[in-house]
Curated annotation (Swiss-Prot):
InterPro entries: Semenogelin. Residues 25-60, 133-158, 173-192, 272-407 are annotated as: Disordered. It comes from the Eukaryota. This is Semenogelin-2. The lineage of its organism: Eukaryota, Metazoa, Chordata, Craniata, Vertebrata. Residues 31-40, 137-158, 174-192, 325-334, 372-397 have a biased composition (Polar residues). Keywords: Repeat, Secreted, Signal. It is found in: Secreted. It comes from Pan troglodytes. The keyword Signal applies.
Length: 407
């Protein structure tokens, strides 16, 4: 408690001394003439200490009226010099920002040149915006994750007072085919590609914008024609014997175009074309044969129900095409179609579990399950190199199995 009371009293004394000194300083400004040279100039250096040092000096009682007058003049001069220094620093900062902008512009141009050399056939997006006669060009290549994503997405938005035009840029050969891993995982799936390109144009360049629009339309039409031709080749590569009864994946091309037309003073046109193409690069073939049930009547009113569930050959063929190169497929004929009657006849005679009772009123149930061959053929073509087809026939039951008779 005593320490707190002493601290409060010391603060009160300091505040009273400061109030007295400030009152004396205000009263002395009108009394002192311009003869400030009566006091030594060595005292001028003391005003460079902070306000804290001044308060500390005032608390000791060593602060004089004349010294306060010198401090006021020097503070005014120092304030003027500080403002001038701040202006110089601001000017230097402005020059530094301009220098950084110029360096960034050069780096962007260099990056654009390198990316243009490396990205032939890739998607690349150019963002140009003009402000005050200076153009900042940036080039970005969308990342193509060939393991997880079907295509890359590039998106850039720059906002300024000029016009924005969006369109779909040229499709490359790399986009025509995804990676082998992605195709192996998704059979018969669709592959879509979205490329969004933003370009901010100067208002006076109407002819250049119109020319670019026509070029984009022509290139887009060529891409659609190439995709249709590619899909047609894939359809012709299927085997005629299985083509009528196989369930194919999506091979059609679905193209959607959303055009947003925005007109400004010079009637520039803003286009946004979104393209969603589903490529028919895979053929997924599954053939089934229906099960049949035959009932036989044996001697003396006996009934024998023979169920012959013959599952036909399941032929799964996957054809993968990369870089527009196609390879014809060899389709394996189903054994149940070619030799259906023989297999059924043999399965009736040599079924696995057959029960026959020749007595009157007894029933015999014959059940035979014969599974056909399962043929899986996978053909992968990567960069013009094809792999040989693998054919794995598997039969669940032998035809020469003995009959088990239970009386």
């Amino acid at each position: 408690m005593k320490s707190i009371i002493l601290f409060v009293l010391s603060l009160v004394l300091i505040l009273e001394k400061q109030a007295a000194v400030m009152g004396q300083k205000d009263g002395s400004k009108g009394q002192l003439p311009s003869g400030s040279s009566q006091f030594p100039h060595g005292q001028k250096g003391q005003h460079y200490f902070g306000q804290k040092d001044q308060q500390h000096t005032k608390s000791k009682g060593s602060f004089s009226i004349q010294h306060t007058y010198h401090v006021d003049i020097n503070d005014h001069d120092q304030t003027r010099k500080s403002q001038q220094y701040d202006l110089n620093a601001l000017h230097k900062v402005t020059k530094s920002k301009q220098h950084l902008d110029g360096s960034q512009q050069l780096l962007n141009y260099k990056q654009e040149g390198r990316d243009h050399d490396k990205s032939e056939g890739h998607f690349h997006m150019i963002v140009i915006h003009h402000k005050g006669g200076q153009a900042h060009c940036g080039t970005q290549n969308p990342s193509q994750d060939q393991g997880n994503s079907p295509s890359g997405k590039g998106l850039s938005s720059q906002y300024s007072n000029t016009e924005k035009r969006l369109w779909v840029h040229g499709l490359s050969k790399e986009q025509a085919s995804a990676s082998g891993a992605q195709k192996g995982r998704t059979q018969g799936g669709s592959q879509s590609s979205y490329v969004l390109q933003t370009e901010e144009l100067v208002v006076n360049k109407q002819q250049l914008e119109t020319k670019n629009s026509h070029q984009n339309k022509g290139h887009y039409q060529n891409v659609v024609d190439v995709r249709e031709e590619h899909s047609g080749k894939l359809q012709t590569s299927l085997h005629p014997a299985h083509q009528d009864r196989l369930q194919h994946g999506p091979k059609d091309i679905f193209t959607t175009q959303d055009e947003l037309l925005v007109y400004n003073k010079n009637q520039h046109q803003t286009k946004n074309l979104n393209q969603d193409q589903e490529h028919g690069q895979k053929a997924h073939k599954i053939s089934y044969q229906s099960s049949r049930t035959e009932e036989r009547q044996l001697n003396h009113g006996e009934k024998s129900v023979q169920k012959d569930v013959s599952k036909g050959s399941i032929s799964i063929q996957t054809e993968e095409k990369i870089h527009g190169k196609s390879q014809n497929q060899v389709t394996i004929h189903s054994q149940d179609q070619e030799h259906g009657h023989k297999e059924n006849k043999m399965s009736y005679q040599s079924s696995s579990t057959e029960e026959r009772h020749l007595n009157c009123g007894e029933k015999g149930i014959q059940k035979g399950v014969s599974k056909g061959s399962i043929s899986i053929q996978t053909e992968e073509q990567i960069h013009g190199k094809s792999q040989n087809x693998v054919r794995i026939p598997s039969q669940a039951q032998e035809y020469g199995r003995k009959e088990n008779k239970i009386s």
